[in-house]
Amino acid sequence: MIIVTGGAGFIGSNIVKALNDKGITDILVVDNLKDGTKFVNLVDLDIADYMDKEDFLIQIMAGEEFGDVEAIFHEGACSSTTEWDGKYMMDNNYQYSKELLHYCLEREIPLLYASSAATYGGRTSDFIESREYEKPLNVYGYSKFLFDEYVRQILPEANSQIVGFRYFNVYGPREGHKGSMASVAFHLNTQLNNGESPKLFEGSENFKRDFVYVGDVADVNLWFLENGVSGIFNLGTGRAESFQAVADATLAYHKKGQIEYIPFPDKLKGRYQAFTQADLTNLRAAGYDKPFKTVAEGVTEYMAWLNRDA
């Protein structure tokens, strides 16, 4: 069996899909379906069982077994970069992850977990997986950074695989439940389909991020499971592209629309990553050599998926 925490969420459900595509259906999805809209991410997927995250954590802490577990993909977390309840964030992202890590280490179960580019904070260059480059801007980034630091202490002694992926700006199918935290491509598509003007912040040609397609993210996760490599790795494309490029690809697909530029909100000033670009040196050195989709390629594929029933 393979366990996917956050399996009804954005990246987790795409990992479930990638496993299904390889003929793997003996999957336990762990999630919190308090937000009932997330169920749609699993409707077209095949899993063996579902468990609430609180029940799962109780069983993990009690040392209970789940049968023959081949691996755990740990994607479950609070991923809101605007959530400032530090206790909630640390319980959800840090303590939970530590419990799961020790459970896996005791049983030599591979653990592949979600870290984040938020660990780098506001820097504009040198996104390198090393302590001197890490300075998170928010408590979400800090919770991810602290778990990475914890893993670094344990890695030299670990007898089983531990791998963390610092996700950059992931976009693609199955993110609709994320609301305001969904990608720009998702929001632009919704605005166009609602007959509204698609909106970007003023200066969006200058805001550049490493936008990585979720299908590529799932591919990397499965490659690492198959190859057993441990460590903490950036997971982006290695290319920074502008929000304007995302809008251009969206409009090109729809063949209509004109961008309306809106003022940059005060509440985000100083807390907003203006530039991200993954350094892929370590990922490539680990042996992962597949190309990543460009924004034009990924957004076009995503638009076709979003509008498949149109």
Curated annotation (Swiss-Prot):
Pathway: Nucleotide-sugar biosynthesis; ADP-L-glycero-beta-D-manno-heptose biosynthesis; ADP-L-glycero-beta-D-manno-heptose from D-glycero-beta-D-manno-heptose 7-phosphate: step 4/4. It catalyses: ADP-D-glycero-beta-D-manno-heptose = ADP-L-glycero-beta-D-manno-heptose. Keywords: Acetylation, Carbohydrate metabolism, Isomerase, NADP. SUPFAM superfamilies: NAD(P)-binding Rossmann-fold domains. Its cofactor is NADP(+). The keyword Isomerase applies. The keyword Iron does not apply. The active site is at Y140, K178. Signal peptide: none annotated. GO terms for biological process: ADP-L-glycero-beta-D-manno-heptose biosynthetic process; carbohydrate metabolic process. Binds 1 NADP(+) per subunit. Its EC number is 5.1.3.20. NADP(+) binds at residues 10-11, 31-32, 38, 53, 75-79, 92, 144, 170, 178. Contains a large N-terminal NADP-binding domain, and a smaller C-terminal substrate-binding domain. Belongs to the NAD(P)-dependent epimerase/dehydratase family. HldD subfamily. HAMAP family: Heptose_epimerase. Catalyzes the interconversion between ADP-D-glycero-beta-D-manno-heptose and ADP-L-glycero-beta-D-manno-heptose via an epimerization at carbon 6 of the heptose. Homopentamer. This is ADP-L-glycero-D-manno-heptose-6-epimerase. It comes from Escherichia coli (strain SMS-3-5 / SECEC).
